[in-house]
Amino acid sequence: MFPGGGKFNPRMMKQMQKMMKDFGMDAEDLKAVKVTIELEDTILVFEKPKVQVMDMLGNKTYSITGKAKKVAKAEEKIEDVEVKVEVTEEDIEMVSSQCGVSKEEAKKALEEANGDLAEAILKLGN
């Protein structure tokens, strides 16, 4: 890639950077700690990568160099679980007497409030 038999010459690097600037290209090293790339079925994680961003006429290109670890993607699907709260007769009587409603109305309000006495009483009070 480099002229001169592949030997790296710091002066040549300076000339290349100047040429890049002349063509509207600018390169900058980023101090990245970790880079994560999320694919459809896996995740690539680069620990201690070398990241360089090149700006070419307003378009930025990121270059990541380092060793990638493949990580299995966790299944994101969470099933809805319906929780049924058991309402006690004591709670029903308390809500019924506090709000002056029938036991059926009190039970319904408690079920809608997932057993929360205060919420059921507030609901029936309005």
Curated annotation (Swiss-Prot):
Start and end residues of each NAC-A/B domain: 10-77
Signal peptide: none
Gene Ontology process terms (BP): protein transport
GO molecular function: RNA binding
The keyword RNA-binding appears for this protein: yes
Gene3D superfamilies hit by this protein: DNA helicase RuvA subunit, C-terminal domain, Nascent polypeptide-associated complex domain
Keyword entries, A-Z: Protein transport, RNA-binding, Transport
Domain of life, source organism: Archaea
The UniProt record lists the keyword Hydrolase: no
Annotated Pfam families: NAC (PF01849), UBA_HYPK (PF19026)
Membrane-spanning ranges: none
InterPro entries xrefs: NAC-like_UBA, NAC_A/B_dom_sf, NAC_arc, Nas_poly-pep-assoc_cplx_dom, UBA-like_sf
NCBIfam families: archaeal-type nascent polypeptide-associated complex protein
Function, in words: Contacts the emerging nascent chain on the ribosome.
Annotated family: Belongs to the NAC-alpha family.
Quaternary assembly: Homodimer. Interacts with the ribosome. Binds ribosomal RNA.
HAMAP family cross-referenced by the UniProt entry: NAC_arch
This protein's name: Nascent polypeptide-associated complex protein
Source organism (scientific name): Methanococcus maripaludis (strain C5 / ATCC BAA-1333)
Gene: nac
